[in-house]
């Protein structure tokens, strides 16, 4: 598809609330094109996540392409792990990265599996603020629900 320019901090589209994506008619060809453009833009950027407003579209969706946190960085998944995850939404076929699109995401940070939340300070970057890393406090667990690129429910957590 198309690699779109990434909007830089200060642009109003990054500061305004995003609009819910209307899925009443299913995933439209226009939405499929937007998602494909976002995936291509993310791949070209070298980032791990991209929201629609970062390419100037004020809609509520994002794409990710992240290393699987259950493995050492860059390590391939063993075949038995691939088999247990095969066909689950949000998993790429290469067995290395978690690749997903989440439409109309809802973030939850309560009810972690271990029963407690821990704040962790880590460095984080943003494609809309190029060349800068920030030390941010994040919970060690979060869950996001929404709809995938086929309009089916998806839940990602970690």
Predicted features along the sequence, with ranges:
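Active-site rim/adjacent substrate-binding subdomains
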Residues: 1-158
């Amino acid at each position: 598809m198309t690699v779109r320019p990434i909007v830089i901090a200060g642009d109003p589209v990054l500061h305004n609330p995003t609009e819910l994506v209307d899925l009443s008619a299913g995933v439209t060809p226009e939405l499929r094109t937007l998602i494909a453009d976002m995936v291509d833009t993310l791949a070209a950027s070298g980032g791990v996540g991209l929201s629609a407003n970062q390419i100037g579209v004020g809609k509520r969706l994002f794409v990710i392409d992240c290393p699987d946190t259950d493995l050492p960085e860059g390590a391939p998944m063993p075949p038995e792990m691939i088999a247990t995850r095969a066909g689950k939404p949000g998993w790429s076929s290469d067995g290395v990265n978690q690749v997903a699109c989440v439409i109309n995401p809802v973030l939850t940070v309560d009810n972690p599996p271990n029963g407690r939340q821990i704040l962790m300070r880590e460095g984080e970057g943003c494609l809309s603020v190029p060349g800068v890393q920030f030390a941010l406090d994040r919970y060690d667990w979060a869950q996001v629900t929404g709809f995938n690129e086929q309009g089916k429910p998806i839940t990602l957590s970690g």
